[in-house]
Amino acid sequence: MEPPSNRPLTLSRIVALTIIGLLVLGLAYLCLAGSGSTVSVPSGAHAGELTLKPCHYATERGSYAADCGTLVVPENRHQAGSRLIALPVTRIRARTARPGTPVFRLQGGPGITNMEFAAASRLAAGRDVVLVGYRGVDGSVRLDCPEVDSAMRRAADLAGAKAIDAYATAYRSCAERLRSGGVDLGGYSLPERVDDLEAARRALGYRHVDLVSESAGTRTAMIYAWRYPKSVERSVMIAVNPPGNFIWYPGITDEQVRKYAKLCAHDGSCSSRTGDLAVTLHSTPVPHRWWFLPIREGNVRIATFFGLMNATPAAAGPISAPRTIDAWLAAANGDPSGLWLQSVMAQLVFPSAQVHGDLAAVARSDAAAAKRYFAGAHDHGSILGDTSSSFLFADGRIISAWPAGPDDNAYSRVRTSRVPTLLVSGDLDFATPPQTAARELLPHLPNGHQVVLKNLGHADDFWAYEPAAGSQLVNTFLASGRVDASRFTTNRIDFTPRMPQTVLAKIVLLVMVALASLTILSMLLLPLRVHRRGRVGRRSAVAIRSAGLVVIGLGGWLGGVLLALTAMPTVPLDSELLLGVSVGAPVGLTVYWAWVDRGWTAATKATGLAAALAGALVGAWLGGYAAPVPLAVLTAIAGAAAGGNLLVLVLDMVRQPAATAAPARTRTSPSPA
């Protein structure tokens, strides 16, 4: 073995320390960039004050000139002297010198930001497009409920009885914590949100505005038109949700299932797999396992309902309705792999999909309907059951868990509106079926129209399918009140998706097992190599302690996920502890075995092992907090690599001067006589 250099800071160590420093700075930036609210009430501000400055807004057609700023509003307009809160406002400027009536865009949800709208470029050619942040989601006060998030993440089954109990308790605890922290929950309602929009309209100096809303956002648009009819010129509602319909009623859902069953019966590939799709969906049991992997029935039924919302793969990707149906048909024929994939995706996605405090506050808009629905036997043997409604409303208990507000019953029934309104529905939409809008809202719109798009589903389908046709429909109506759906063609439902969930599931499992096995194999081969050869070669060690750690860390995490799925059902798959240990331990051991020399003393080896493991575990834990999953996996690996390598480098620099300062043991020749 070559004698060690007597210089603690060699060129290679300087390079390594520089790379580690850059990794640490990058992780620190991610932590700081993702923390805290970016909106606050300016000093000395008053209610209704709007401050704007030039900015740019990213759209699907590139960056558009815009104005960004803050609107100050009272937290609760029912309370004199209520404190002020701030909301973000973005105005994407019209691309014309003579713009038409500006449009306010209203996102769905609940619990989803109103500040992201890449399709703004489809509307901004002739008018300003304005985004006003939703109170409770986008503003200086955010109704986050980590109690609810945690209860969902730790649920053995998202729709299980124990989980529902935990959700109700968590919502109550969240409300109590927010109130004790000074949040006036009575101010977080849809009418208050509408008053925010009206305040923005006045502050911007607009005489009238148009509204383009979708899904839950259509309820806000309805209330705006009922509350301020003179302020709204025209309204386009996509995926319409009249009062009382935040609940998904099993009977109406059955009507939508039968539409798919009819399409299936006329499709050769689908009809060859089932005589009646509706019967197959109703009668096929959810198996407990796929091979050694458990399948959680409640997760599957929730994922199935959401998977059936959108009919086009462009809108829904791997969870589109054709893929969801294909997974059930495969399960009916003995291959439940697609249902396992649905179960895992539900477990990963739903706990963090929404701001749950806003969901609870908005759900109270349908408090009366929810009480009626959940008071009796609400599922009478329907095809899919009512698992999704029970999950969303915690079996109705969210209504009692979240405090009542002064606006709960203000708009619980449909009112008449003379605002020219266009209702746009997909005929296969499970969340907001077109027949509901036709029966419950359209009769109350003397100047209303409805367009039902054949073989399309929820709002995402509208934006993804034939964008030019959708833009013409919306822009023509906003400009003239005329309905022009002439450019739409009928979507064809493909019951043989190119990448079915069954194939995706097998690919996912193969990758998980392969990388986990590679990590385990590396943990066995590296010590064996050190035992046989004394140490890992310098070039190999550099490769292993850098790029190799990405594979080792990823395989470690996937192995941890497999362990959690099979043996620890209440451990969240995105658990910080699971991530830290499953990444940190193999990365630390790999750093150690790529660093150690067989000839070193036992004390040096033990110190090195402790340093590598401690640095990697702490680094993985800290890195896991730098970003949300799945990006957190990479930041945890980066943190583990930085921590493990840093401590063994420091150990090298500390011990090397001492080693070189020790007297050399040399063999001398005897002097001649």
Protein language model annotation of sequence segments:
Residues 83-164:
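N-terminal cap/lid subdomain of alpha/beta-hydrolase-fold enzymes
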Residues 145, 150-155, 223-280, 304, ...:
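A catalytic-pocket lid/entrance helix-loop region that shapes and gates access to the active site
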Residues 454-513, 657:
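Catalytic active-site module of serine/aspartate enzymes centered on a nucleophile-bearing elbow/loop
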Residues 430-436:
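Conserved alpha/beta-hydrolase "acid-adjacent" motif
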Residues 179, 191-208:
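Conserved acidic catalytic loop of the alpha/beta-hydrolase fold
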Residues 55-88:
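N-terminal cap/lid segment of alpha/beta-hydrolase-fold proteins
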Residues 206-216:
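Alpha/beta-hydrolase fold nucleophile elbow
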Residues 10-16, 28-38, 277-419, 498-584, ...:
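Alpha/beta-hydrolase fold active-site neighborhood
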